[in-house]
Each structure stands twice: as structure tokens, then as C-alpha cells.
Amino acid sequence: MFEPFLLAVEGQEFLTGFHVEGPLAGLIIILIALLLLWIFKKVLKLVVVLIGAVVGYFVGEAVEPSLSLVFAAGFAIVGIWAMSGDKSKKKGKKQRSILKDADDWDDDSWDDEGDWDE
């Protein structure tokens, strides 16, 4: 049997030293799944930043080999900044549409001006 599910086996005192029954085992499995998802999210961000650093290194090698590590560090910093979240929320500003600032975006009065059939 797969070892993590041994906690859910009734009558087994594996690893914990106490008897685990259905609802508690389900709660433990759900909490472990949530922890793994949280860790995967963090690892995924780290992988994206590392890929950016490798791309920066290769760009640096193509441009100037002596600056390849500087390019890699720069791309890694940009990757960390990009993965840190939504920048507009941190500033407290709301995104506005271009149409909200325009005064006449729904002004149909130009249709009534002049007679085109003359």
C-alpha cells in the first residue's frame, strides 16, 4: 500500500501512534494536498525565475561574454519583479478605461448636425 495513505487505514497505528478514523484522515489528506499545492506554486515561480536567468545568461553570451552573469542577474531580478504579483493593486490605483475619461464617447449629437441630403 502507498505509505501516505496508511494513515487512513482503520486499525493501523502507523507513524502517529494513535488510531485514525475517517473524518480525521480525510482532513489530514486535504491539508497535505493544500500544502503540496502551496509548495508547488512557490516552486513554479522559482522555476520561471530560473528560466529567465538562463535566458539572460544566453543573451549576455550573445551580446558580450564578459557581461553574461550581469545579464543573468538582471533577467532574474526582472523575473522576480514580474512574478511578485499585480503592480496596480500594490499602488492602490484603479485601472481606468480610456472611454471613462473621454467626454463625448457616447455623444450622438453629431448625427443631428447638418443635413447630408442637401
Swiss-Prot record:
The chain crosses the membrane at residues 20-39, 46-63, 67-85. Residues 103-118 have a biased composition (Acidic residues). Residues 85-118 are annotated as: Disordered. Keywords: Cell membrane, Membrane, Transmembrane, Transmembrane helix. It comes from the Archaea. It is a multi-pass membrane protein. One of its GO terms (cellular component) is plasma membrane. Its main location: membrane. It is found in: Cell membrane. The keyword Membrane applies. Residues 88-97 have a biased composition (Basic residues). This is Uncharacterized protein AF_1991. It comes from Archaeoglobus fulgidus (strain ATCC 49558 / DSM 4304 / JCM 9628 / NBRC 100126 / VC-16).
